[in-house]
Design a protein with these regions (language model features):
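RNA pseudouridine synthases
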Residues: 1-179
């Protein structure tokens, strides 16, 4: 079992499940895993509850992550072998992720943002573009629709960093709605 993850009825939807993986739709305002101030309201708690209700053993093996305020698909491995295979596929970029977001202002029809991301000095959570010490981060975007106030974007990440889309869109002067 996953130590420290208490089974709790946190809502999510199962999109796909087989003997190897579980794919769920994570709602917005749901942290992925327990952290300071979030011990019983996370997706991990909900997944533990799900398996407890089925009477199946549970080890939390989350393959991808999304920010707390982001909704989308999360892939979980149901055993060590599928975790190893899926983790390697993520590292070698065989798994492609496409996101949609709304950003302030009118963005170009398409673009690529190639700017390294690092932790903001003095913060464990916040990230920023940092050309001196950041890790390579690349975002490709395409504008699906726009008006004078905001743009609806489709985004693809070459790399995966914490707050990647949020940081890159703010960097080019088009912060995500709500930021």
């Amino acid at each position: 079992p996953s130590d420290g993850i208490l089974p709790r009825p946190v809502p999510f939807s199962v999109v796909y499940e087989d003997d190897d993986i579980l794919v769920v739709d994570k709602p917005a305002d749901t942290p992925i895993h327990p952290s300071i101030g979030n011990y019983e309201n996370t997706l991990a708690n909900g997944i533990a509850w799900y398996f407890e209700q089925k009477g199946e053993p549970f080890v939390y093996r989350c393959i991808n992550r999304l920010d707390r305020d982001t909704t989308g698909l999360i892939v979980l491995a149901k055993h060590a072998l599928s975790a190893a295979v899926l983790s390697q596929a993520m590292r070698s970029r065989e798994i492609h992720r496409t996101y949609q977001a709304f950003a302030l202002g009118e963005t170009a029809a398409s673009g690529t943002i190639d700017a390294p991301i690092a932790r903001l000095n003095g913060s464990l959570i916040q990230r920023t573009v940092d050309f001196a010490s950041g890790e390579r981060s690349v975002t490709h975007y395409r504008t699906l629709a726009h008006c004078s106030v905001f743009s609806h974007l489709e985004l693809n990440l070459e790399t995966g960093r914490t707050h990647h889309i949020r940081v890159h869109m703010a960097y080019i002067g088009h912060p995500l709605l709500g930021d």
